[in-house]
């Protein structure tokens, strides 16, 4: 795409650079030169990179998460209620059954996801 740049009445076409022009060989080499030292350090010190051997770092908050998002928590009930209300309103506005089915599918995914993570 060409644009026109005018300075005091004179005009010269200026070609707009493409997004892909940033992915040159020199820029890729600069990126690799920045990423390789970090990757090597992560390989040499995996205990720092992944907290290996430290046990479960999030175990302390497990009870809090289960109390907040567990099966009998009020947040789950409010989320399901919000899904039903939004689905009903969207159906009434558009008269499209896909919204009702979509929110039912989202409810199933949320229930399955919570059972997978153990809530």
From Swiss-Prot:
Quaternary structure, from the entry: Monomer. Interacts with itself to form filaments; also interacts with TraQ.
Gene name as annotated: traA
N-acetylalanine sites (modified residues): 52
Propeptide residue range(s): 1-51
Main location: membrane
TM stretches of this protein: 74-94, 99-119
Membrane topology according to the record: Multi-pass membrane protein
Identification of the protein by name: Pilin
Cytoplasmic side: 95-98
Record's GO cellular component terms: extracellular region; plasma membrane
Subcellular location: Cell inner membrane; Secreted
Pfam families in the cross-refs: TraA
The species this protein was found in: Escherichia coli
Alphabetically ordered keywords of this record: Acetylation, Cell inner membrane, Cell membrane, Conjugation, Membrane, Plasmid, Secreted, Transmembrane, Transmembrane helix
Entry similarity comment: Belongs to the TraA family.
Signal peptide: none
UniProt function note: Propilin is the precursor of the pilus subunit, pilin, that forms conjugative pili, the filamentous surface appendages required for cell-to-cell contact during the earlier stages of bacterial conjugation, and that retract after contact is established. Mature pilin is assembled with the help of TraQ and TraX.
Periplasmic side: 1-73
């Amino acid at each position: 795409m060409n644009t026109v740049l005018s300075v005091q009445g004179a005009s010269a076409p200026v070609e707009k650079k493409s997004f892909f022009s940033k992915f040159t060989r020199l820029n890729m080499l600069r990126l690799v030169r920045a990423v390789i030292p970090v990757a090597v350090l992560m390989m040499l010190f995996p205990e720092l990179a992944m907290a290996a051997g430290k046990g479960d770092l999030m175990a302390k908050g497990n009870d809090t998460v289960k109390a907040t998002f567990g099966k009998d928590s009020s947040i789950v009930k409010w989320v399901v209620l919000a899904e039903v209300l939004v689905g009903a309103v969207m159906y009434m506005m558009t008269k499209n059954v896909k919204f009702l089915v979509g929110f039912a599918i989202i409810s199933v995914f949320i229930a399955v996801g919570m059972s997978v993570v153990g809530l």
